[in-house]
Amino acid sequence: MSLFTNKTLLITGGTGSFGNAVLNRFLATDIAEIRIFSRDEKKQDDMRHAFQLKMPEVADKIKFYIGDVRDLASVKNAMYGVDYIFHAAALKQVPSCEFFPIEAVKTNVLGTENVLTAAIDEGVKSVICLSTDKAAYPVNAMGTSKAMMEKVIVAKSRTVSPEKTKICCTRYGNVMCSRGSVIPLWIDQIKNGQPITITDPTMTRFIMSLDEAVALVLFAFEHGESGDILVQKAPACTLQTQAEAVCELFGGDKRNIKVIGIRHGEKMYETLLTNEECAGAMDMGNFYRVPCDKRGLNYDKYFKQGDTTRNTLTEFNSNNTELLNVEQVKAKLLSLQYIRDEMGKQ
């Protein structure tokens, strides 16, 4: 990882699943320092002790900063001397954001504005922001706040030279076994002899591992241009398929799956690339790149100039991507350390 040699990386919301995955990936490399910025001192203390036990020889590379992305002063305090930022801080629970939408705006929209403002002021070289498929065609408060976050990112990228600060965004689907995701809940339900609860068996969701989430961010870091939104071509599955896979791995009864109905703000399927974005998107193999629209507000010159280019890409959603079967989902789950650890406890 030569790009990170002797560099300082700041991760906002760094005590979450993504932050832990980044630490596992980078801590033993020649990176100089990784700063964890978050508002929960208990989670920071837990993370500190965990890495002191797991990787004692390099744990001193981790520096902890208590603060909130809503507070510009605390963000700036953590930003001094930082080379790169992975911005993962967010409110991401869909039902909670439905009841407290302004809180989602404060963290996901205004908090992102604070991070980018501080990054530009401090001369940070690269900022990669984490978004979600729920930002595409949003129907809920969380998705709407993330869609606005993406607009802030693109707008902010227009105000600064990419040679000074490059600002990119990644958009991805459900990360399996991440904090607050459904699979750990199902495992607990099986172990306690309770029914597995699913909202709708035909609902589809993109699925990816934490390692794949980190890989997407690194792809954006290395190949993205300022203002880009980068999307991974992730597979998907139905909730029924996912629940059956978990049952088979953990000895659950597939007849004991209980349908509880869709929760506040949920969609039947998710979209990673919209039809509108397809007009300017680029196919990059395992990824799509949605470049920033670099036109200004003076449209007259564009009308005169014209543009005859057409794109053959179509909307990419969890209904038209590759749908995995039970065996394929089981194989994907077995690749996760969390699943192997939980199976070892049986």
Language-model segments: which ranges?
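N-terminal Rossmann NAD(P)H-binding glycine-rich loop of SDR-like oxidoreductase domains
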Residues: 7-29
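Strand-loop microenvironment adjacent to phosphate/nucleotide-handling motifs in alpha/beta enzyme folds
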Residues: 151, 155-177, 181-346
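Conserved residues in the N-terminal Rossmann fold of short-chain dehydrogenase/reductase
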Residues: 38, 65-66, 106, 200, ...
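Conserved Rossmann-fold NAD(P)-dependent oxidoreductase catalytic core, especially the SDR/UDP-sugar
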Residues: 87, 91-147, 151, 155
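Conserved Rossmann-fold cofactor-binding substructure of NAD(P)-dependent oxidoreductases
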Residues: 63-84
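Rossmann-fold scaffold of SDR-type NAD(P)-dependent oxidoreductases
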Residues: 12, 79-88, 129
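Conserved glycine-rich Rossmann-like NAD(P)H-binding loop of the short-chain dehydrogenase/reductase
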Residues: 30-43
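Hydrophobic/aromatic anchor residues within beta-strands of the central parallel beta-sheet
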Residues: 64, 104, 127, 167-170
